[in-house]
Amino acid sequence: PSFNYLVNSSHYIDYNYNLQSPNNEIVTQIGGTVRLAKLFDTQFFVDFYKIDHYTYFNSSSLPQQSGSSLNISQIGGESTLKYGKFNLNGKVLFQKALNNENLLPMPDFIGRINLFYQTKAFKKAADIQAGVKVYYFTKFASREYSPILNEYILPSATAYSIGGQPIADVYINMRVKRMYFYVEGQHIN
């Protein structure tokens, strides 16, 4: 685990701790990617993660280490479709903690679509890209941020759930030689 999990000395009495006899986290990843370049530049992937001795902060902001492994599976894909100067890029991810799901809250589904127009301008001296991105992820009780620890802690019983609604952003970016301009309106919906 990182040093922040091992020991903390604070003026706030509730934030003084020392994690006794910690074990090293062991992360094992098995997975692969299949690319189908002929079909809209598409790729699919599958990943499986096994994390032994997973270290986390509980809802009381105290470091803990899991006695059993945390197993996570992910299946997803990405595809890009081009038609003239219009581009459509979509990405999906299905993920699930197979056990100890309360130790690492996460959305079961994450999706993103990016529709943009890309062209050259000013006698081909500039590249311009303008578009809209839409994100969505399923509702889940997210971990809470502790500014005293500068870490995320497990959600409390009264935790606020996030997700379950789309988020849309609009943007325009331009590159002229070595200079980049980027303007984005986030969460316009």
Residue ranges and their predicted role:
Residues 1-189:
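Exposed, low-structure sequence patches enriched in small/polar residues
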